[in-house]
């Protein structure tokens, strides 16, 4: 008997599991992204120059990270190098990778997740959203659906962006696109 895996392909999982590669793919697909640096050059000088171009406050994030590990909020240039070294060290220890991305910080954001579903024929739909803004240490504590600040126009725009993101990686199965507002 054949066993059929239901879910995203190994290629989609690998791509979306790396924040730098995922962000480059989303930008290429025209999906709105927070401005930042997701390049392959990872030396301190390159990242410092990118930080100056992005401006402060900014976030340093482990490309292989999740759950808030390998993340540092930097409020000014004087604190960048120490935060960079700390984030890189945590990323290596937690994920075995020293690749980092930089993003303009969104202070006190709403964390909204859009549910999507894709089939094996390339059809992808968005199903709704939930507000996951109540967090502790970057871990969700409460999920509220529907999102209380959502308008029909914003829901449509976010849903269409989530579908575009999923199509960019040929996503199959149930998934979630995370959005900061």
Language-model regions, residue ranges each:
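N-terminal beta-alpha lobe that positions the nucleotide/phosphoryl donor
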Residues: 1-177, 181
